[in-house]
A protein has these predicted regions:
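Non-heme Fe(II) oxygenase metal-center motifs and adjacent flexible, charged/small-residue loops
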Residues: 1-203
Length: 203
């Protein structure tokens, strides 16, 4: 793994993984605290959050977080998301067309270890994740021996970038915590196929 760091005018980026298995970069303080708080408040109030249920083994269970999805072609896209897109493109200049949002209401909300469904992504296009609200840990774990494990604290205003290849080699998730934590919103920018063949299990 490369131990190099990168510096930008918006924040300090740590190269977490950079090898044949993919590239992941964590940019702390990609935007300032005031802006991050404003975006959080606007999205928390304005987004039409939904509670989903999913089949697990032989029964349906509640998804332990609230979800939403917006298209970048939506003329009513909140200004905060357009501004966040501009920020995301400072780090990955891709033609993002999809925004997935998750609201973790407290420490009981989580997302299990997973990789993004590669069939629902344009090959070789990056994913950019923006964190807003409370700090939560993300656990990144290698799919193959020795199952490398990386834990990152994602704070308000942080960005995490992942390239396409990492989805084949690593899972990522937000575990539950017993700590008293406030709500957190994650904003995920992706490049989806234009043929409409995606849509199940959006995160």
């Amino acid at each position: 793994m490369s131990q190099l760091s990168l510096f930008t005018s918006q924040g300090h980026g740590e190269v977490v993984i950079d090898d044949t298995s993919g590239r992941i970069v964590h940019i702390a303080d990609a935007t300032d605290a005031v802006t991050a708080a404003r975006w959080f408040d606007q999205l928390h109030a304005a987004v039409a959050w939904r509670a989903d249920r999913r089949l697990m083994y032989d029964r349906e269970v509640d998804v332990p977080r609230l979800l939403a999805h917006r298209s970048l072609n939506d003329p009513e896209l909140p200004h905060s998301l357009r501004d966040a897109l501009t920020l995301a493109r400072r780090y990955e200049d891709a033609r993002f067309n999809s925004i997935g949002l998750n609201l973790y209401r407290d420490g009981n909300d989580s997302v299990a270890p997973h990789n993004d469904k590669v069939a629902e992504l344009v090959p070789n296009m990056p994913i950019v994740l923006l964190s807003l609200g409370a700090t939560r840990q993300m656990v990144i774990r290698g799919k193959h021996p020795p199952h490398r494990r990386i834990v990152l604290d994602l704070r308000a205003g942080d960005i995490l970038t992942m390239d396409w290849a990492t989805q084949f080699h690593y899972d990522h998730g937000i575990p539950k915590t017993r700590d008293a934590v406030g709500p957190r919103i994650s904003v995920a920018f992706r490049v989806r196929p234009s043929d409409g063949t995606w849509g199940s299990g959006r995160r």
